[in-house]
Amino acid sequence: MTLRIETASNGRTATLRLIGHVESEYLDELRALVRTQRPRVVLDLHEVTLVDGAVVRFLIACEAEGIELQHCARYIVEWMNRERRREE
């Protein structure tokens, strides 16, 4: 399965719904899309089934920039927490 991205906006907030496998090969496209969706961006991860390490680091950076992560699977949250602790 590949990554599919659905975008919804109400004028103030853009929600990017990520569906499927989010792997490092898609990060350039995802970064560019996030940049064009300002001022407020939400990443909805409800239908994400797989991520890799580069994506976890990208999600950590997104949070640091104020991007909200919604419906993030427990394994991704735990992986992000481990990465943060490792960087300390």
Predicted regions and their residues:
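Short beta-strand/loop segment at the start of cytosolic alpha/beta domains
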Residues: 1-14
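Charged, elongated alpha-helical/coil segments that serve as electrostatic interaction surfaces
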Residues: 2-3, 86-88
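Amphipathic alpha-helical interaction surfaces in cytosolic regulatory modules
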Residues: 18-87
